[in-house]
Structures are given as C-alpha cells and as structure tokens.
C-alpha cells in the first residue's frame, strides 16, 4: 500500500504517532527490529501535564492519572545539603509511571499493526513514496517516521547530519520499597546525579536513576551515596541495578530529509538528569498532530517549520542540561559554596520557581 505511513520503531513515541494516525483513519504500519518486547520494571518516566493531556486525547481508555503517581514536591540537594524545593499547591509538578506499563497501555488496539523482527537495511525514495527494505521483505509508503531511538537505523540510512557527544557517565536504574510522600529527590555530587522518583504500585517505591562517572562497582557506589547523602529517606540497601549504558547527547540538525521525519530520541537525545526526553518526543508528536495532513503529504514548508520549532525547544533543553551538568556534574571546578548559595538564592523567589515548573511542564 503506497499511501500508508511507515513508522519505524514501536517504543512509546512510535505508538503515540500510531494512535494519532489511527484516530485520523490514516493507514499505517509499524516496523520493529526486535522479535519481542523487552521489559524492565525498574525503568520509569516522568510525564508532564502537557504529555498526559495529549496522550489521554489519543485514547479515552488510557486515563494515566488513574494509575500513575503524582509528584507534588521536588527537592534538590548538593551532596547532603537541601538547597531548592519546587512545589505547587494546586498542580502536581509531574507524574511518574513505569515505562513498561505506559507502553503496554499504549499498545492496546495496535497489536495487529506491528510487524516484529523487521530491521531496516536499505531504503529507496521516489518523488511520492519511500520503500524500506528488510532482509526478507520490502514496505512501501508515502512517508516514514523514524521513532527507532538514539541509535536510529533509519536516521543513519537517510544520512542526517548529527551533532553528538558523550557525557563520560553511565546510567543505572533500580526500584526499592520506601515511603515516598509523593516527593522526588535529586542529589548532585562530584560523582554524578542521583534521583529518587516516587512510584505507587502494590506498595510505595522509589524509582532510582543513578548517573555516574565512577569506574568502580556502581552498586557499591550507589549504596554508599544513599548512606552518606540520603539517609533521611529511610531507604534500605539496594540489592541490584540494571542499565550501565554510556550517556550521550545527539541532535539532528534537521528533523526531516526527503520522505523521512525523525521523532523523539531518533532526532534528539538528552541526559536523563532532566527527565524530559520522552516528553520532548511527545512534544514532537503534538506538533505533528497540529500539522498532520501537510507533513504526511511531504509539504516542505510544514516539515521545515516542524524541524525549526522543535529543534528550538530541544536547544533550550540542551542548554539547561549542559548548564546543570557543567556546574554540578563537574563541581570540582567550582566552589561548593557558590553552587549552594546560588540554589538557595533561587529558592527565595517563588515566582522564579513557578517559572521553572511551568517550563518543565511544557513540551
């Protein structure tokens, strides 16, 4: 079918686009390179209010607020010292959910539209269509959306120009039972960042995200940091962690090339310090939703507008992350007292803190 839309990648971003196309009665097909879905209950995501509202409009049965965990207060520390508290009386800061749960909920109603085990190895474009080739089959469509993550095969085949760099850190995740009071905690130290995100399942848990530059045993380092910096959270010993991948940033200079459009991590990836990667990908889908007919028809001004506006937002987030990483991730180069006093100064201005929360909740 040459008028169908091809979506490469069946992660959350790919499923968001699929739900959008399904809602508009536009034919589509999802190509997934893996032969099965891999689950990890320790992985969580923080969703903004913008993201939740948009996702709920795509599927009336999703109702994220009914099963996810709201964050009412976020506390930021430099080592052991609390320097900044972000809270909002009438509106939660963000919402935490297991990535597997979000994915399985988004997957409902799309199962028959996904073809597993289809790794793209070549592509061919014409004036009105694009054909993607796998080892065993070819798929033709009007447009292809690259939603296949940070190491996007489709992006590589399309020869996008990409800027990238490594942070010199690895990321690990864990899940530990603890009373959380709907509070998130983030610790900045010389060895990296340590976040505790509240998660309510059968019991209360903290989802732990640990980004570190240490080369010794990361589990031992994590438990040492918890003991030294986060004793007041009453968290027991973490028995196991998963992950360990190298953290890198990449940004495609344009989000479209020919009949290929990048969405989410395929176009831009971010340090998990800010927890905004998925939200920005959903923001990409929100822009596409507002201009869907033009974009899937290959309208060049519409695709240029998508690329320019989304990359502006992505550049803003990159600047914020680089500023935080430069200060806290390399705090050996700055006086600890300078960092502490800077955060405490900001903590005295409610309007400034409101602006931070407002920006964080915009995709």
Regions found by a protein language model. Name each.
Residues 55, 138-242:
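Conserved FAD-binding catalytic core of PHBH/FMO-like flavoproteins
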Residues 4-6, 10-72, 97, 101:
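Glycine-rich FAD cofactor-binding loop and adjacent beta-loop-alpha segment at the N-terminus
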Residues 216-300:
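FAD/FMN-dependent oxidoreductases across multiple families
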Residues 30-31, 146, 263, 270:
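Generic enzyme active-site microenvironment
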Residues 231, 290-363:
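C-terminal helical "tail/cap" subdomain of flavin- and related membrane-associated enzymes
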Residues 53-157, 163-175:
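Conserved N-terminal helical subregion
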């Amino acid at each position: 079918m040459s008028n169908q839309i091809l979506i490469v990648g069946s992660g959350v971003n790919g499923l968001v686009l699929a739900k959008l196309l399904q809602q508009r009665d536009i034919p589509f097909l999802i190509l997934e390179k893996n032969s099965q879905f891999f689950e990890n209950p320790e992985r969580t995501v923080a969703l903004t209010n913008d993201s939740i509202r948009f996702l709920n409009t795509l599927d009336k049965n999703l109702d994220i607020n009914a099963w996810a965990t709201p964050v009412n207060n976020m506390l930021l520390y430099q080592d052991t010292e609390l320097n900044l508290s972000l809270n909002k009386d009438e509106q939660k800061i963000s919402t935490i959910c297991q990535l597997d749960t979000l994915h399985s909920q988004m997957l409902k109603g799309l199962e028959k539209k996904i073809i597993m085990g289809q790794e793209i190895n070549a592509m061919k474009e014409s004036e009105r269509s694009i054909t993607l080739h796998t080892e065993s089959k070819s798929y033709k469509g009007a447009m292809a959306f690259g939603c296949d993550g940070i190491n996007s095969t489709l992006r590589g085949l399309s020869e996008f120009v990409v800027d990238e760099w490594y942070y010199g850190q690895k990321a690990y995740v864990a899940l530990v039972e603890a009373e959380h009071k709907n509070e998130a905690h983030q610790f900045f130290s010389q060895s990296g960042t340590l976040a505790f995100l509240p998660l309510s399942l059968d019991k209360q848990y903290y989802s732990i995200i640990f980004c570190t530059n240490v080369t010794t045993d990361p589990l031992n380092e994590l438990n040492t940091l918890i003991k030294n910096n986060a004793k007041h959270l009453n968290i027991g010993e973490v028995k196991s962690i998963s992950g360990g991948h190298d953290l890198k940033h990449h940004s495609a200079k344009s989000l479209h090339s020919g009949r290929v459009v990048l969405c989410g991590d395929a176009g831009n990836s971010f340090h998990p310090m800010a927890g905004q990667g998925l939200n920005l990908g959903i923001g990409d889908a929100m822009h596409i939703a507002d201009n869907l007919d033009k974009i899937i028809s290959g309208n060049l001004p519409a695709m240029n507008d998508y690329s320019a506006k989304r990359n502006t937002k992505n550049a803003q987030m990159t600047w914020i992350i680089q500023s935080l990483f430069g200060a806290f991730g390399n705090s050996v180069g700055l006086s600890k007292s300078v960092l502490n006093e800077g955060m405490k100064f900001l903590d005295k201005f409610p309007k400034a803190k409101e602006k931070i929360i407002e920006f964080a909740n915009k995709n």
